[in-house]
Regions:
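Acidic, glycine-enriched active-site microenvironments
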Residues: 1-236
Length: 236
């Protein structure tokens, strides 16, 4: 099973994670982390579509290099990839189940990308956190399992692991930006204020393009101090 989660705790820096479980056990070597490349702002649906596309387009590309005659086969794409994995010819097999963290919207975005890649037969579900509802393609009503079932507990475990990895990656990138930031030398900017600025705007370059009034929307920053900060950051 492979599970995807989007983390956008920073409004200008979205990331995603993919965790893989084999026989109910984390396959840590095949975890993946993604920086969202094509989406501006917070858009979970578009971000989910991007990471699904990148993950499975790459697997298909790798499979094509070991099976160049796949286009002449009567097998489906999923059947071909699983046969190659059984023969030991594919670098990594397609999962038995794809899980996306979210409800109908995330599931629809992910399903659309799988269909465009020809992976119509690849099973996929969405697991929504609030009520632990399971959404399936083509089904309007969610599936609700008893909270004490082993199946739901396994789904929750892999979903929570994907969530943990995505958030950890976002925090790692934020710490990296803080370490490298020009704000370190800016008068009147404490470490706490720097963290808030980078979390809100993403980078020094984006802060430079904001007005003092926009920056002052952050708690604890006045228009006057924002003006002084911009003057310092934009100095020649």
């Amino acid at each position: 099973m492979e599970c995807f989660d989007i983390s956008n705790v920073s409004s200008n820096h979205n990331v995603a994670s993919m965790v893989r479980f084999v026989d109910g056990v984390p396959d840590n070597q095949n975890y993946r982390r993604y920086r969202i490349r094509t989406v501006e702002g917070q858009d979970d649906f578009a971000s989910m579509a991007e990471v699904i596309r990148r993950r499975y387009a790459r697997i298909l590309k790798e499979g094509a290099t070991v099976n160049p005659d796949a286009g002449d086969s009567q097998e489906s794409v999923v059947e071909t990839m699983r046969r190659l994995a059984q023969e030991g010819r594919a670098p990594i097999t397609l999962p038995d189940l794809v899980i996306v963290d979210g409800g109908k919207g995330q599931l629809s975005s992910a399903t659309g990308e799988l269909q465009r890649l020809g992976l119509h037969e690849l099973p996929i579900i969405g697991l929504a956190k609030k009520r632990e509802e399971i959404f399936r393609p083509g089904e309007s009503d969610p599936l609700v399992l008893s909270h004490d079932t082993g199946a739901l507990k396994l789904l929750q475990r892999i979903r929570d692991e994907a969530h943990r990895c995505a958030n950890n990656y976002n925090e790692l990138l934020l710490r990296k930006r803080m370490k490298e930031s020009l704000l370190d030398d800016c008068p009147g900017v404490s470490p706490k204020r720097k963290a808030a600025l980078l979390s809100k705007f993403g980078s020094v370059e984006r802060i430079r393009r904001k007005s003092a009034e926009e920056i002052a929307e952050l708690p604890g920053i006045s228009v006057r101090s924002a003006e002084a900060m911009l003057q310092w950051l934009n100095r020649e």
